[in-house]
């Protein structure tokens, strides 16, 4: 299906690009989330009329993400979980736990923005985690997990 992208989409294209994607991806994800529209003549004309406005909004969103990224960069998140004697956790630390703790520290981060490269953290110690604030802004933070013996 031919679509017009209304936002930058990772591995697909940028604002204003007319691209061909699988029908299901367009119908079930891109169009309902407002990231794209079908590439009809009417939608192309409407997009060109709103292009400047959309580019300003995208630039503002990028600037906001970069400002938040500068504040967030180098942040350390400290979490305490129950752990065994050998340092393995009973359970794990997930992206939701990290996003919740960042929220307590005053940062607005969704759990989908927290990227755990090796899956959930299951051991006590320091781990480096990426936070994708925007498709162009990815910040690394340190997560320190302390063990609490039961």
UniProtKB/Swiss-Prot annotation:
Family indicated by similarity: Belongs to the bacterial ribosomal protein bL9 family.
One GO term describing the cellular component: ribosome
Matches recorded under InterPro entries: Ribosomal_bL9 (IPR000244), Ribosomal_bL9/RNase_H1_N (IPR009027), Ribosomal_bL9_bac/chp (IPR020594), Ribosomal_bL9_C (IPR020069), Ribosomal_bL9_C_sf (IPR036791), Ribosomal_bL9_N (IPR020070), Ribosomal_bL9_N_sf (IPR036935)
Source organism superkingdom: Bacteria
GO MF annotations, alphabetized: rRNA binding; structural constituent of ribosome
Gene3D superfamilies in alphabetical order: Ribosomal protein L9, C-terminal domain (3.10.430.100), Ribosomal protein L9, N-terminal domain (3.40.5.10)
UniProt record, GO biological process: translation
Keywords: Ribonucleoprotein, Ribosomal protein, RNA-binding, rRNA-binding
Name listed for the protein in its UniProt record: Large ribosomal subunit protein bL9
Function: Binds to the 23S rRNA.
Species whose genome carries this gene: Variovorax paradoxus (strain S110)
Keyword Transmembrane helix appears in the UniProt entry: no
SUPFAM superfamilies according to UniProt: L9 N-domain-like, Ribosomal protein L9 C-domain
Keyword Transcription listed: no
